């Protein structure tokens, strides 16, 4: 299970991980799998974790937020839901937008030294999720580049280690969707 806590005092919900609806076949259980990370307390997060991706997308589309970190969680969850439903063009677009939003959040946090390292983890999530989508789209070079960036931002994060290992063994199927109570 991959968990992170956001230190802004906003939402703090326990994180869980589940096997996704697009899990690999039983024969592939021992091989490491790519992992998507969603924000359970972001728009659509609980539905994503329950494997109700269409319902999650509906909830996400209806959600309106004022805070930039809430928007980042929303668009990240949209990226994950589209990837899980194998709508790769939409997933790629959402992942790109989640990355832009996470970068903007990080730039705002750089004013506060303690917030910068936390934001690095959130930015690593955006890169790692986009890497999964790149692997699904059979673009391993772009995926490797994104995972290298994720590793440089959060070298000890479990989702980074798992995705790097999965890439090394050429396993590009999604086995898990993980939630973090970060936004």
Question: Predicted regions: what is each one?
Answer:
Residues 28-30, 64-69, 101-120:
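Flexible helix-coil transition and linker loops at the boundaries of alpha-helical arrays
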Residues 36-58, 62-65:
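Alpha-helical segment of the N-proximal tetratricopeptide repeat
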Residues 148-183:
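Terminal, low-structured helical/coil segments at or just beyond the last alpha-helical repeat
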């Amino acid at each position: 299970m991959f968990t992170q806590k956001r230190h802004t005092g906003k939402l703090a919900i326990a994180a869980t991980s589940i096997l996704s609806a697009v899990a690999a076949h039983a024969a592939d259980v021992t091989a490491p799998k790519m992992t998507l990370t969603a924000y359970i307390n972001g728009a659509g997060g609980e539905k994503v974790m329950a494997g109700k991706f269409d319902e999650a997308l509906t909830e996400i589309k209806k959600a309106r937020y004022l805070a930039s970190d809430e928007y980042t969680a929303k668009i990240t969850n949209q990226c994950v839901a589209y990837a899980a439903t194998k709508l790769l063009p939409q997933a790629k677009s959402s992942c790109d937008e989640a990355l832009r939003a996470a970068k903007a959040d990080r730039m705002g946090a750089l004013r506060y030294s303690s917030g910068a390292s936390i934001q690095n983890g959130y930015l690593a999530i955006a890169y790692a999720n986009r890497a999964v989508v790149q692997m699904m789209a059979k673009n391993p070079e772009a995926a490797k580049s994104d995972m290298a960036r994720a590793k440089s931002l959060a070298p000890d994060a479990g989702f980074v280690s798992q995705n790097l290992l999965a890439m090394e063994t050429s396993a590009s199927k999604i086995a898990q969707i993980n939630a973090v109570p970060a936004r």
